[in-house]
Amino acid sequence: MMLYGESVTVLLCALFIGTQILYALASMIDIYLFRLPVDRVDMTEEQDLEPGDYPRIVLFYPVLRELEGTMRTTFLSLRHLRYPAGLFRVMSIPNSNDLETIASLRRLQQEFDFLEIMEIPATSDPSWSTVWDAWSENPKCYWWHQGSRAENRDLPPKKTRQLIYAFYTLAARERGGSDFLVNYIDADSCPPPDHLIAAAIGIRRFDVLQASNIAGNLNDTLAASWHAFDHMAWDGRKYKHLTAGGRQPFWVLGKGLFFKASDLLALGGFHPWITIEDPEVGLRFWANGKRLGYIDNPLIEEVPTTFGHGITQRKRWVAGFFQSLDVPLKALGYSWQSRVKAWMILIPCLSYWINPIGLPVGAWAMWRLVSGSGPLPTWTIILSAANVTIWVLSLCLLYRSIWQRTALVLERRRDRLRYLLRCNPVALMIWGLVWIVPLWIGWRMYRRDGGLIWERTEKVDANASLVRRITHEI
């Protein structure tokens, strides 16, 4: 009969082997993704642009109960966009019952003459018939034709609903005219001056364009530093490999992206019943043969300065990821192989779930190995050493990337070093454990069909001084 101590040892060995295999799987997926080629927008081609190469662009600005200061900072950056006059529009799209935000926008119109406002009515308004008619005629709008919410007009009150109404309303007004590009940003997103120029260059070769993002307030608090790290690792480093010459399913990032209006119309606009619209619309475009191009110059945004607000934001991301990888993949006709590729985008993030077991049993295995009483097979030690080596190398490459990207928003080297110190390897292990909270809440939201109300991330105009310094505004 096996003694209690022996039983515990067997259990710990099994847990160690299992977690190391899972870590290795996550590492192999990451290696696969990072080996994919990057399709960049080549900004040196600006000199080749002819007057007829500049498409019309409409930048939608969905807002909900935003601070006037936050919106002013964004509009300061928009005022410095370089693009031929008359070829781009900035259209704010608040809900018609958001009276305080509308009043702020009216005041800001006196300061920024390029700003237009389109108020989004309730879905009971007759003007929504433009959307219902378009969806009824388009089989690509599978959510309208299939499932428990088929022809349900009571769309959830969130950013996606605002984008849907604004896009279809504008497209109806422009019917018969030339095509245009659809661009949208968040309330705090501050594009660089060449943002629209990059679109004019890239759309000649690609169907969808996505700019990178970077947090401007990355040193405000420890929470802000860790939240900004997610963007450093994902938006700024890994995401661009999803371009991959069209071989890899992709998501979009929810701001700083460009679609052709004709493509967005043909493919059904935005899915209203998913917590965040970004992953599904990218997966839908890829399923229909559209290629993604990456814009290096990032938008500056602010990240939450408290862990509570960060968890609120990230649980919505997670719910949207799971939702997009479920019913939509089947409705879009993804093959088994394509579904696996789509899931590969998320699986490395799910490795955070391994840490509560993997870290302590890893420490136990190290102790047994050092003490000379290790019961583990040699191959498991080799696998563990390989995992640690890959982790260290990936951290070195990531820190190099972070050092380069922090120069975009931090002037002083000591501030950049301070950020690296806050994101040291031990801190990242702790952050990985914290991430389990939004992963779990987001998973529950997905299972319970939640996330249909816009839980906005609080914006506090954190980048006011940075944007004014960059744009030389007083």
Language model segments and positions:
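N-proximal low-complexity "stem/linker" segments adjacent to membrane-targeting elements
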Residues: M1-L76
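Juxtamembrane C-terminal module of membrane proteins
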Residues: A26-R56, K330-W343, S371-I474
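Short, well-formed alpha-helical segments that are part of the catalytic scaffolds
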Residues: L67-H80, D98-S104
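Short, acidic, metal-binding catalytic loop of nucleotide-sugar glycosyltransferases
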Residues: T74-L87, Q110-E111
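A conserved acidic beta->alpha catalytic loop
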Residues: P94-L108, P121-S129
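Long helical/loop segments within the catalytic core of UDP-sugar-dependent glycosyltransferases
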Residues: S127-G176, P193-I274, I311, K315-D326, ...
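Short beta-strand-to-loop acidic/aromatic patch adjacent to the donor-nucleotide binding site
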Residues: G176-C190
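Catalytic donor-sugar/metal-binding loop of nucleotide-sugar-dependent glycosyltransferases
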Residues: L283-I300
